[in-house]
């Protein structure tokens, strides 16, 4: 009862704030909050929010572009197809802070070096866009998310008053940036998440993310804001501090099976099947292999052609995970490898061999664990062709 009452009061108070433009005092501060990654898959790259604090007015709010409504009709379908709308939400800072303390996730605050007019302009912009008719937007992982939106807000509100001393460096592709984070360079490794993302992301992920493009990652947005210049002289960031520290946890990593270890092991074991005469065993293995590849191909084809997820378009992984492998698997189970399927096997073998030969110059970076899988496919195709001769 008390919890529901507090929630109602929070919603009511935030609703009152949205409905009116409050003049900020000279003591007001607007800052960027950069949150470290969490354990859930959707928390792997951290989070970004904007804090508006004005002690004289009794304001301490967090504006968050990472909100979506689980009660949305057909939520799961819309989420999968990339049609789910995200929105800008407002919360009291204390509630926001409590959440990250409970999850043991660090929060870094960068206070912007705004004058009063700039503070008011940004605050008014946020309030206007938090209104129900303006709050929703079409989320895009690379090009329009909770982090990149903050960059856009400052560009839109400050105009020519904000410039950047863009550093000269070798910019990475979107995929390389994701790999850098997931591979444990900054946070604990997530090898299976890394493998899954490399499989589902298409060629757009291999485009170079420039200074503005890389702001889709909260840490890089925070870093790039340090190169901001206000009114041709002052730095954009006035101060930088950790407001929610992260407690140290054990760095001991227990042995675990990674995609690379698993698939190289399977590839090695499969090589011995050339000497196995048990037709039932090898037939079952080939059926499972090509059925799994085919079903994966159906998923990736759907993500490319049936959704609005642009990052999944033009996925070359379909070359070795063809949806047609499902039909091949069925015919393997039926012992029906006729002339058509022999030609299909030959064509598939050529495609997979070419992928291996041109691995380093393909327009899409494949995950290293895909190499032993493709090698395994080649071995089983050769075995199938030999068996049908």
Can you describe what each PLM-predicted range is?
Residues 38-39, 105-113, 132-141:
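Second-shell loop/turn segments in exported
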Residues 117-126:
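Short, charged, amphipathic alpha-helices and their helix-cap/turn boundaries
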Residues 128-325, 329-330, 337-341, 349-389:
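Activation targets extended, charge/polar-rich intrinsically disordered C-terminal tails
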Residues 1-21, 388-389:
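Bacterial Sec-dependent N-terminal signal peptides
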């Amino acid at each position: 009862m008390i919890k529901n009452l507090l929630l109602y009061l929070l919603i009511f108070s935030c609703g009152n704030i949205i409905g009116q433009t409050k003049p900020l005092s000279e003591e007001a501060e607007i800052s960027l909050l950069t949150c470290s990654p969490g354990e859930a898959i959707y928390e792997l790259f951290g989070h970004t929010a904007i804090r508006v604090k004005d002690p004289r007015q009794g304001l301490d709010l967090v504006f968050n572009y990472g909100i979506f409504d689980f009660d949305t009709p057909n939520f799961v379908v819309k989420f999968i197809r990339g049609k789910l709308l995200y929105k800008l939400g407002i919360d009291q800072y204390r509630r926001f802070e409590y959440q990250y303390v409970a999850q043991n996730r660090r929060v870094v605050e960068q206070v912007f070096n705004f004058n009063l007019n700039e503070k008011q302009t940004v605050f008014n912009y946020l309030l206007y866009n938090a209104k129900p008719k303006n709050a929703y937007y079409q989320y895009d992982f690379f090009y329009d998310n909770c982090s990149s939106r903050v960059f856009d807000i400052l560009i839109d509100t400050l105009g020519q008053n904000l410039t950047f001393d863009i550093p000269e460096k070798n910019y990475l592709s979107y995929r390389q940036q994701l790999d850098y984070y997931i591979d444990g360079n900054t946070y604990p490794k997530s090898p299976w998440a890394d493998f899954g993302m490399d499989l589902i992301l298409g060629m757009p992920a291999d485009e170079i993310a420039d200074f503005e493009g890389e702001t889709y990652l909260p840490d890089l947005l925070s870093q790039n804001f340090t190169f901001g210049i206000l009114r041709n002289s002052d730095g954009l960031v006035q101060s930088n501090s950790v407001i929610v520290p992260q407690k140290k946890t054990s760095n001991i990593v227990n042995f675990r099976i990674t995609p690379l270890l698993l698939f190289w092991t399977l590839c090695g074991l499969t090589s011995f099947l050339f000497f196995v005469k048990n037709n039932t065993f090898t037939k079952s293995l080939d059926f499972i292999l090509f059925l799994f590849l085919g079903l994966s191909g159906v998923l990736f084809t759907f993500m490319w052609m049936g959704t609005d997820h642009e990052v999944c378009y033009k996925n070359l992984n379909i070359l070795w995970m063809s949806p047609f492998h499902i039909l091949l698997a069925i015919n393997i189970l039926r012992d029906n490898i006729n002339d058509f399927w022999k030609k299909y096997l030959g064509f598939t073998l050529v495609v997979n061999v070419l992928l291996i030969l041109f691995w380093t110059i393909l327009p899409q970076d494949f995950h290293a664990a895909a190499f032993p899988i493709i090698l395994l496919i080649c071995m089983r195709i050769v075995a199938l062709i030999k068996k049908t001769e």
